[in-house]
């Protein structure tokens, strides 16, 4: 009989590329997988996946009310399900997973996409920070099994709580011909900007340097396309209006994962920027960093440890120490105007993608679950 795995998130399932990859790989490895998330009021229909998907409805949409309601609903849902193991994705679903795993006496795992308590939107709010830090201190030591996105975060969890987590990077599936993605743009999709354009894809949240990126576009001779939404959408739109960039900065909104690769491949430059506030940003290794590599486009990224380590090995990006307005515009213009540099970085992307890809990462992922259920074969 197949082992039944449950994974829990607080976001809508349609756009979660990492969880789609993880659940698909474990399903292909022979597990019976269910992914549980939230249902937003304007959520599109779920796509067909090789695993089960379940979306919880909530009255509250954000804030403390949402997290309390969602965790209660999640607890009672999980309590009624048959499962062999349970994996909490980030800190905001860890409590119900811990309680249900104790009640049901089943293995539990923690998938830490980031240092949750050190995110800018948490660390900048002392009351919220204290609540989540208490949850982290109580729960994480009780999750001896888990994985995260890079060695820096894994080392931090070991330093704080004595748990040694594996590293599963957010790299895309290696495709034989990424250029073919361009031909797969949906017929009904809005047209892309004409000529060379700069792309930001991902959450439009606090701490992503939009306060500097948007005004920097005044001095850059190319449009900026933003694919995504988040808690900084209204301030970002206000910045565009403030600087008169309505014809230069384009908001595309949310894009389904299957529709995103052709857009990424059509871009000329990618953007991976984070503010320094919060250790989570400093230790980050964003999905889009690898998405740009696989699309074969050079990018502008912050000179933080995880990005620096990869760039030192493959030189696929221009890194900035300080993501200020002048630094961003200078770096973007360098990529736009220095053809030799651009094509060197582009060629290096093609080499880097052969090493950083999901086919390599999923081997480690599957091994984690094999060890969980059959430890005698790995001792």
Where are these regions (language model features)?
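Nucleotide-activated donor-binding/catalytic signature segment of Leloir-type glycosyltransferases, i.e.
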Residues: 227, 234-262, 269
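Membrane-proximal helix-turn-helix segments that form the acceptor-binding/catalytic region
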Residues: 24, 72-79, 95, 99-103, ...
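Conserved acidic donor-binding segment of nucleotide-sugar-dependent glycosyltransferases
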Residues: 313-325, 333-340
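Conserved donor-binding/catalytic core segment of Leloir-type glycosyltransferases
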Residues: 5-8, 147, 191-221, 225, ...
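A charged, aromatic-enriched C-terminal amphipathic alpha-helix characteristic of glycosyltransferases
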Residues: 340-373
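Nucleotide-sugar donor phosphate/pyrophosphate-binding loop at the beta->alpha transition
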Residues: 65-69, 107, 117-139, 206-207
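Donor nucleotide-sugar binding/catalytic pocket of nucleotide-sugar-dependent glycosyltransferases
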Residues: 37, 54-55, 133-188, 193, ...
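Acidic donor-binding loop of glycosyltransferase active sites
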Residues: 264-282, 297
